[in-house]
Curated annotation (Swiss-Prot):
Keywords: Hydrolase, Multifunctional enzyme, Purine biosynthesis, Transferase. It comes from Brucella anthropi (strain ATCC 49188 / DSM 6882 / CCUG 24695 / JCM 21032 / LMG 3331 / NBRC 15819 / NCTC 12168 / Alc 37). CDD domains: IMPCH. One of its GO terms (biological process) is 'de novo' IMP biosynthetic process. This is Bifunctional purine biosynthesis protein PurH. InterPro entries: AICAR_Tfase_dup_dom_sf, Cytidine_deaminase-like, MGS-like_dom, MGS-like_dom_sf, PurH-like. Pathway: Purine metabolism; IMP biosynthesis via de novo pathway; 5-formamido-1-(5-phospho-D-ribosyl)imidazole-4-carboxamide from 5-amino-1-(5-phospho-D-ribosyl)imidazole-4-carboxamide (10-formyl THF route): step 1/1; Purine metabolism; IMP biosynthesis via de novo pathway; IMP from 5-formamido-1-(5-phospho-D-ribosyl)imidazole-4-carboxamide: step 1/1. SUPFAM superfamilies: Cytidine deaminase-like, Methylglyoxal synthase-like.
């Protein structure tokens, strides 16, 4: 049953006479406490926060003096007391509330400055179970929710970044805070506790291997506001979840303009793709446009890999995203800056490479310090009208033992290497996906078509265009291998690849007409390998 309201109007300005400070993150704490003291605000505090304030000679009263009860159970119980929550929740214009405060000796609290135990940090650093549980804050969220609910009389501050604004408002309004400002702080406070509880909920689900919990929360903290979203009429913001997976969200931007919404989306796609290739074994480069690869290649050096990737579709690569699985060096940088590029993302960049890229002031250069693990668990989410689709991250990686030769002819070693390369790339191409590969480089990519045969034809045409631009006598699809992200429902898609010049095929299999497709491959002397793993991408 809902609780009814007494409809007591809130004051526009409310004087801050008493503040409660209890923080885990002590950034800016002392200067803020000094400013409050200068405004004549009485400061209550807890544990380490009180000690830090007192050490600077700022008058402070420990909460235990107010409650008449000491901290117990290793600090688990210190603010869970009517003297605290009554002071936060009391409606100051309600006679019954005021009478209760007087009867029980409860003083009002007008400002609650609370930030929480660093649960998210401990979680993503891989803390053990007991340590992570111990960093679940109880009293902090309770005080935040109490004070934010009572924003008519209490201002709630959960972020040190807001200290300066609070001080400015106090100075502007002679020690009072306006209702609109208190509402703004309350909204942020509830967002903070919601995100905190979401992190705890998601961690527990992971801890007990519950993949589809009854309640699923996705939360993040605003990192930056975009100029616009996918299109200029759309608003957008970039939120960080706290996950420490190397990538665009955790990267350091060394130079260039602010990343746009589309830049972030494309850069993430590019870096996740290039991470499929072990830098200890090979150098790899991916060039991305609209979250689809224009070209991907591996080679002995980053420069060579870039040039091979670029050759796949040099027209589409203009204005693209370039991702590397190794350090950006001078030789590669000199080649990349020859055409207009939006973003370069790499684990690192040499000083010489940075100097070369610096000549292109708008070119964004990101370094990540490492590569994401393609096999790591995680979630992927999409919104639909009235709902949220959540699935596990596509972390499937095909190993040699997963491969099954289903044709009369087995692939050669060279074909097999290219097939595995092509299938990894195909995982990152929008479905229906067809990828032609030769000598460790894509030579034609067909993406996002409703018909698999159309994707095969588009990839072949792309290869023909690239060959013509390079002055080659014939497309590089002659003697290539082909990968499909899903099974061939009919033999026509396979026959299109054969017509383009493919000599070997890798695909998941699983069609009702697999036998028909295999027979067509045998008829044309094609080697075919099935993986048993589909990689739809929408």
């Amino acid at each position: 049953m809902a609780v009814s309201s007494k409809h007591i109007p809130a004051p526009d300005l409310h004087r801050v006479r008493r503040a409660l400070l209890s923080v885990s993150d002590k950034t800016g704490l002392i200067d803020f406490a000094k400013a409050l003291h200068a405004q004549g605000v009485e400061i209550l505090s807890t544990g380490g926060t009180a000690k830090s304030i007192a050490a600077e000679g700022i008058p402070v009263k420990d909460v235990s003096e107010v409650t008449g009860f000491p901290e117990i159970m290793d600090g688990r119980v210190k603010t869970l007391h009517p003297a605290v929550h009554g002071g936060l929740l009391a409606v100051r214009n309600d006679r019954e509330h005021v009478a209760a405060m007087e009867e029980h000796g409860i003083g009002g609290i007008d400002l609650a400055v609370i930030n929480l135990y660093p649960f998210e940090e401990v979680r993503f650093k891989g803390g053990d179970y007991d340590t992570t549980v111990e960093n679940i804050d109880i009293g902090g969220p309770a005080m935040i929710r109490a004070s934010a609910k009572n924003h008519a009389y209490v201002a709630t501050v959960v972020d040190p970044a807001d200290y300066a604004d609070v001080v400015a408002e106090l100075e502007k309004h002679a020690g009072s805070l306006p209702l609109a400002f208190r509402k703004k702080l309350a909204a942020k406070a509830f967002s903070r506790t919601a995100a905190y509880d979401a992190a705890i909920s998601n961690w527990f689900a992971e801890a007990i291997n519950e993949e589809t919990p009854v309640y699923r929360s996705v939360a993040g903290k605003l990192h930056s506001v975009m100029r616009y979203g996918e299109n200029p009429h759309q608003t957008a913001g970039f939120y960080l979840t706290g996950e420490k997976r190397p990538g665009v969200a955790t990267a350091t931007q060394l130079q260039g303009k602010q990343l746009s919404y589309n830049n972030i989306n494309d850069t993430d796609a590019a870096f996740e793709l290039v991470a499929e290739f072990d830098p200890a074994r090979t150098a790899a480069v991916a060039i991305i446009k609209h979250a689809n690869p224009c070209g991907v290649a591996e080679a002995a050096t980053i420069k060579e890999a870039y040039l091979k990737a670029l050759a796949c579709d040099p027209v589409s690569a203009f204005g693209g995203i370039v991702a590397l699985n190794k350090t950006l060096d001078e030789e590669a940088a000199e080649e990349i800056v020859k055409i207009f590029t939006e973003v370069i993302i790499a684990p690192d960049a040499t000083e010489g490479a940075q100097a070369i890229v610096a000549a292109k002031k708008n070119l964004r250069l990101l370094v990540t310090g490492g590569l994401p693990d393609p096999r790591a668990k995680g979630i992927a989410a999409k919104t639909v009208a009235g709902g949220l689709l959540v699935q596990s991250r596509d972390n499937g990686v095909v190993d040699d033992l997963d491969l099954k030769v289903v044709t009369k002819r087995a692939p050669t070693e060279a074909e097999l290497n290219d097939m595995k390369f092509a299938f990894r790339v195909g995982k990152h191409v929008k479905s229906n996906a067809i990828v032609y590969v030769k000598d460790g480089a894509t030579v034609g990519i067909g993406a996002g078509q409703m018909s698999r045969v159309d994707s095969a034809r588009i990839a072949a045409r792309k290869a023909e265009d690239a060959a013509e631009a390079a002055g080659l006598a014939e497309p590089l699809t002659k003697g290539c291998v082909v990968a499909s992200d899903a099974f061939f429902p009919f033999a026509d898609g396979l026959l299109s690849a054969v017509q383009a010049g493919a000599t070997a095929v890798i695909q998941p299999g699983g069609s009702m007409r697999d036998d028909e497709v295999i027979a067509a491959a045998d008829e044309h002397g094609i080697a075919m390998v099935m993986t048993g793993m589909r990689h739809f991408r929408h």
